[in-house]
């Protein structure tokens, strides 16, 4: 992004919701947005029409105009109808948490595989938005161009999306077949596969670089690794293949997670998974992210051996560290936890 686009960040807080404001703000700043203001509202439940209160939408519009913001991003997940209604009210671009994450994915994508996966994820995630747009535009009898999610009759839109999704999936299948051939070759050579996994920025790529003397990018914010890398690891008595993979994120939308299936396959085919947990974060974050990581690993690799690596322990002192480690051991009962 050559020029920093000004954005207002919004969050609707309802009972049981985990605040995401700081996470989304960090991602947006990593992409290149200038977050000029953050607004939040506590409610008993989401407004089905615009997520947040209608009066709050008017405030968002006023703040955006006063501060020159052309983008309004929600830390929440929005429906297609909510996005379109808010967009119409504020006359600006509206993003939700998942679209912000996808924008970061697009910025970080370096390989053909990751670019295809991101394109597929965006199509699948915004498909319902497009249908809603076509429906709403039809009701309003407005002319819509193909630049928006709609643009033509619903059946044509649906057919076009299905065709594009089919093409992307076919290309990803070809990449997956190629990876499967490489895995079969590794198995034939007798190399066990060790997969690194964990929440984004947990330190797994730093570990990968130091162990295999690689120079993958690190320290650029969330989701530096969007594709997998595999390197031969020389060990006393037995060599192995060390694989780095995409970082996990809490509550990633299932459609986005499914689009990265070829990447997660590297974990499912491993002989051993090393799960990195950043224990330097606050206790609640460590607990939530541990559960999120465990859920994903057990979904894609339910029977694979797992070792949990408590990372960044030098940043936590004394009894606090022991308390964090105790919580991790309880979460991953039955698995080895290091140290």
What are these regions (language model features)?
Residues 71-74, 218, 337:
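Short catalytic-loop micro-motif centered on adjacent basic/acidic residues
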Residues 89-149, 314-339:
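Canonical P-loop GTPase G-domain recognition
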Residues 1-103:
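N-terminal accessory targeting/assembly segments
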Residues 10-12, 197, 276, 309:
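Short hydrophobic segments within beta-strands
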Residues 4, 133-261, 267, 272:
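Conserved G1/Walker A P-loop phosphate-binding module
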């Amino acid at each position: 992004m050559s020029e920093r686009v000004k954005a207002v960040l919004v969050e609707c807080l309802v009972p049981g919701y985990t605040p995401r404001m700081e996470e989304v703000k960090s991602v947006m700043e990593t992409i290149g947005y200038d977050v000029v203001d953050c607004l939040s509202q506590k409610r008993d439940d989401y407004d089905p029409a615009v997520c947040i209160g209608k009066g709050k939408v008017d405030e968002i519009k006023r703040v955006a105009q006063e501060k020159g913001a052309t983008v309004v991003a929600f830390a929440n997940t929005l429906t297609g109808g909510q996005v379109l209604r808010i967009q119409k009210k504020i006359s600006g671009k509206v993003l939700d948490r998942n679209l912000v994450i996808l924008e970061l994915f697009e910025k970080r994508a370096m390989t053909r595989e990751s670019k295809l996966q991101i394109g597929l994820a965006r199509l699948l995630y915004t498909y319902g938005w497009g249908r809603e747009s076509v429906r709403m535009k039809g009701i309003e009898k407005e002319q819509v161009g193909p630049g928006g999610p709609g643009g033509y009759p619903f059946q044509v839109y649906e057919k076009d999306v299905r065709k594009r999704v089919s093409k992307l999936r076919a290309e990803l299948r070809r990449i997956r077949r190629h990876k499967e051939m490489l895995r079969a070759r590794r198995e034939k050579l007798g190399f066990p596969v060790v997969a690194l996994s964990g929440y984004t920025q947990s330190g797994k790529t730093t570990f990968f670089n130091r162990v295999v003397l690689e120079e993958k990018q690190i320290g650029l914010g969330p989701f530096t690794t969007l594709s997998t890398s595999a390197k031969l690891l020389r060990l006393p008595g037995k060599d192995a293949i060390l694989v780095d993979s995409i970082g996990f994120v809490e509550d990633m939308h299932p459609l986005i997670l499914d689009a990265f299936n070829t990447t997660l396959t590297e974990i499912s085919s491993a002989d051993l998974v090393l799960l990195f947990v950043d224990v330097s974060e606050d206790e609640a974050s460590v607990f939530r992210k541990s559960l999120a990581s465990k859920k994903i690993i057990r979904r894609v690799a339910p029977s694979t051996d797992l070792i949990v690596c408590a990372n960044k322990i030098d940043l936590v002192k004394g009894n606090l560290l022991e308390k964090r480690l105790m919580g991790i051991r309880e979460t991953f009962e039955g698995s080895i936890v290091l140290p």
